[in-house]
């Protein structure tokens, strides 16, 4: 074993120790550890399960806290253990054992990188589930097909992350794709990961719907907003709501059109409209639509609060509904984020849900 390799491994452990100390301060390790002990106590109380919703919230909080506290504990233990193992394997000239130490240290680096990535989740709702609204722009079939491609892209991304998805509303295009859709994404940090996808997505390709095989440009809008729980109070005056029922359209089985089970709620002071047609029950669809409305009102309030701050940040683009954020040029095999400059050539992989590079770049640059 070369001295340079041994020194490099020891330096890696020293670097990990310093990064671990920094992130313990930044993430308030002791505060989270104390809270984890409280949450474990709450979760072991048999009476908690009399309130399933509260039990679910406690379970979610416990998982998030354990992901930070136990990972930092594991890294600290791993650093000390591997320092001793380096000494032992060097003394015994145990190359196989030394290789195992190198592999274990690489695993610790991966855990640290994952924690450092979570530092970028700095909004209160980042750990929450989220909703994604996808709407085709002008252009008929071309735009509707593009909206359908985005629908699939985000569905595949969610599957890759092990998230659950639920289609709450889907309006099929006349020939292909969708006119609009809303999906719910359930998973740890779903909103934090996906929130920077809000904006207008532009597609340039040779159209499969054009017999002359001309190049077409299509647009679709994406809006991501967090699912909020009872810890965030959103007051809604029933007098501000207009509630309409209608027969659902789109995918969902033959039963979906037999009754007026779909629900549309309009919040008249803001003009926000939410729709749900996922369930046979009008009552269930109304409840789901109300949750979507609460989430949209929360997102609207958060955007208002951040408006002044964003205006002062030089070079920071407006990520509102009307802003173009990403260009997908398929015939040139190029997808580029217009805010961060991040670009890839494997268009097929991106449209199949490989969005990690784009999301990491946008979070690091704070778009």
UniProtKB/Swiss-Prot annotation:
Belongs to the prokaryotic/mitochondrial release factor family. This is Peptide chain release factor 2. It is found in: Cytoplasm. InterPro entries: PCRF, Pep_chain_release_fac_I, Pep_chain_release_fac_I_sf, PrfB. Disulfide bonds: none annotated. The modification N5-methylglutamine is found at residue 254. Peptide chain release factor 2 directs the termination of translation in response to the peptide chain termination codons UGA and UAA. It comes from the Bacteria. One of its GO terms (cellular component) is cytoplasm. SUPFAM superfamilies: Release factor. PROSITE patterns: RF_PROK_I. Keywords: Cytoplasm, Methylation, Protein biosynthesis. NCBIfam families: prfB (TIGR00020). Methylated by PrmC. Methylation increases the termination efficiency of RF2. It comes from Neisseria meningitidis serogroup A / serotype 4A (strain DSM 15465 / Z2491). GO terms for molecular function: translation release factor activity, codon specific. It holds the Pfam family PCRF.
